[in-house]
Each structure stands twice: as C-alpha cells, then as structure tokens.
A protein has these predicted regions:
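Short, conserved beta-strand element in jelly-roll/cupin
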Residues: 36, 48-65
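A short, sequence-level motif marking secondary-structure junctions
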Residues: 8-9, 26, 37-38, 78-81
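Short acidic-glycine-tyrosine-enriched beta hairpin
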Residues: 69-85
Length: 113
C-alpha cells in the first residue's frame, strides 16, 4: 500500500495539537498520523480510548505524558504505547508519528474531567 501526502486529512484539536491523518488500512487494522503539538492534549481533563491502542514515536521536541497515573518524559527516539482503558494527558512541544490500532474511531475516545 502507498499513500501520498495529499491523501492525508489535516486536523486541529483545541489546546495546540495539529496534524495529518492518513486513510485507515483497508482491513481497518490501523491508522497513521503525523502530529505536531505545542500545548496540551486534551485541553482539559484526560483522554481515554475504549479499544484503540495509540503508539507514539517522538521525532523532535519533548513531551510529558501522564498515562494511568505514571509520568513519562519523551525525547526524540522514544516510543510510548497507550493501551485502551488508560486515561492520559500529554503536554509539551514536539512532532511525532502516531500509529493507532485498530483503525481510529472517534466514537471510542472520551474526554474525562
């Protein structure tokens, strides 16, 4: 499979998160995104996925991730895996490649206060 950059859809999330999300694989088993962040996600509270795993590979910058009550300082080359059912919050400035498995489904993501 091959996707051109022009096939990706731009997105913006309040709090300073922007990026490109590529089409999900035909089998629906994964979605890939390139994410640039300068702020906090989510803007308030925490995010939680019911069934998607988010794998974040940091390309540049630095991020502080709070996942399931643990804190992780990410620097370029670090990989963070956020399993379903873990509330999380990410702050900082950086650029990452994010792999979401199975394919992204916004309905399974919740913002908790």
């Amino acid at each position: 499979m091959f996707y051109k950059n022009s096939q990706a859809v731009k997105f913006s999330i309040p709090g300073g998160t922007n990026g490109l999300i590529f089409p999900s694989s035909p089998k629906g088993d994964q979605t890939m995104a390139v994410v640039e962040m300068d702020g906090v996600y989510p803007e308030t509270g925490y995010s939680l996925n019911d069934f998607c795993t988010e794998t974040i590979y940091l390309l540049e910058g630095s991020l502080l991730a709070e996942v399931g009550g643990q804190e992780y300082n990410l620097t370029p080359g670090d990989l963070l895996v956020i399993l379903p059912g873990n509330r999380y919050r990410i702050t900082g400035r950086g650029k990452s490649v994010d792999l979401i498995t199975p394919a992204w489904d916004k309905a399974q993501n919740h913002i908790l206060s």
